[in-house]
Amino acid sequence: MMKDGLYDLFCESLESLALKPGQQLVAALGGGADSQTILDLLMRFRQQNPQYQYLAIHLDHSFHPSSADWSSTIEHAAKSYGVKTVFEPLNVPIENRQSKEAAGRESRYRRMAELTEDDAVLLLGQHRNDQIETFFLQLKRGSGPKGLSSMAAIQPWVGSRRLCRPLLSVSKEDILSYAQQQKLTWIEDDTNYDTRIERNFLRHKVVPLLEQRWPQFGNSVLRSAKLCAEQQQVMDELLQEKLYKAQKHKSHFPLSLLSEHSAAMQRALLRVWLQGQEYSLPSYEQLEQIRLQAQSATDDSQMQVQCDGYSVRYFQYALWCDNNTGQLPADCWLAEANVNLGEWGTLSVPDALLTNNNELRLTFSLTSEKLAKPGRQGRKKLKDWLKQAGIPPWLRARRPILELNGKYVWVAGLGWFSYQVIEKTEFDSLQLPEPDWVSSGADSYRQL
């Protein structure tokens, strides 16, 4: 492929995104010929399209002894274009049974999401050869149509961000040819030849042998991946419609769907529900645990199937996702209207509560005393009010509570509670605006 042909293909890919003026286009730089080609193509595109924002990011997780030198070389090449750059070291936590490569990839994507605007497009240098290798890796894992679809040319990312792979149909040979014609500088990572790494084994040992025997084998793999993607898209659209009609709340999976369908359809519906919650999909074994336990679950059974970073629970004829990952904030006295609760979100309280020498405290501790609510008869314990409100047991101790002058006056999800506070004035007659609690996602009840 001629270099202008590659540039035309790149432009077509970006034009399909329906970009808006001021939108951020970000080149993810790894240092290889593919990402350096992406940067060069993007800079050519910038000359004709100055209406967008442009950024190049390189994150060094120091897996290779020469990574610091590589970063310097990559940074010098990027800055020669006069583009805004971010070059950072990256600490990569590696969990049990997680490969170094997978941990590095997750950490890179997480940090790049933090460094980019909400509607940014992240441009990746993955190409035809990468797509073929990905298909084989998914095949090895026993994946269905979704996994065998491999990588999408354009896919949603975090928030309104998108990932874009303009070179996905281009061979590595054509990319190298372009890089040489453009006199680009890139890094040759010697670990790419280590066949102990699965992808490298496929790249150097398996795929060349298959294409030597069947020259069109690679094209057949790409066609199969595309057909799997189309099949998955149709299936998802049909399942989402069925799920939407049965749901009362987007965050819940109604168990009535399980009783109406076969085991295969049950698993498919559960997958599409979890995908809609933006969680990683469970393994087949985990999905089967969820399906089987849900069929016999009761509110007293305390069903909990642990998945990757979240668990699936049962409450009131529905399944819920619980992604609590940390400890609750410590109790604290409030002197300001806005409180940052870390991963538990933010809380904004009315200024009136901070006047008249009031002592205002934030707590997550459930009181055993009985409380009254404005306009409601009788007094109940807080746990009973929470139960009546339909809040699951595991979330009842995760509600921010305001304590004014030693008395509970407000609970997230329940609103104001009533008692005499100032000059025998009933608290509910003060008509204060509700505090505003915005969860960061640690509370699965946030979507109700």
Curated annotation (Swiss-Prot):
Pfam families: ATP_bind_3, TilS, TilS_C
SMART domains: TilS_C (SM00977)
Gene Ontology MF terms in the entry: ATP binding; tRNA(Ile)-lysidine synthase activity
Keywords: ATP-binding, Cytoplasm, Ligase, Nucleotide-binding, tRNA processing
Subcellular locations according to the entry: Cytoplasm
Coiled coil: none
Residues engaged in binding ATP: 30-35
GO biological process: tRNA modification
InterPro entries according to UniProt: Lysidine-tRNA-synth_C (IPR012796), Rossmann-like_a/b/a_fold (IPR014729), TilS/TtcA_N (IPR011063), tRNA_Ile_lys_synt (IPR012094), tRNA_Ile_lys_synt_N (IPR012795), tRNA_Ile_lys_synt_subst-bd (IPR015262)
Top-level taxon: Bacteria
Main location class: cytoplasm
GO cellular component terms listed in the entry, alphabetical order: cytoplasm
Entry's EC annotation: 6.3.4.19
Catalytic reactions of this protein: cytidine(34) in tRNA(Ile2) + L-lysine + ATP = lysidine(34) in tRNA(Ile2) + AMP + diphosphate + H(+)
The family this protein is said to belong to: Belongs to the tRNA(Ile)-lysidine synthase family.
Matches recorded under HAMAP family: tRNA_Ile_lys_synt
Entry domain remark: The N-terminal region contains the highly conserved SGGXDS motif, predicted to be a P-loop motif involved in ATP binding.
PANTHER family linked: TRNA(ILE)-LYSIDINE SYNTHASE-RELATED
Function comment: Ligates lysine onto the cytidine present at position 34 of the AUA codon-specific tRNA(Ile) that contains the anticodon CAU, in an ATP-dependent manner. Cytidine is converted to lysidine, thus changing the amino acid specificity of the tRNA from methionine to isoleucine.
The protein's name in its UniProt record: tRNA(Ile)-lysidine synthase
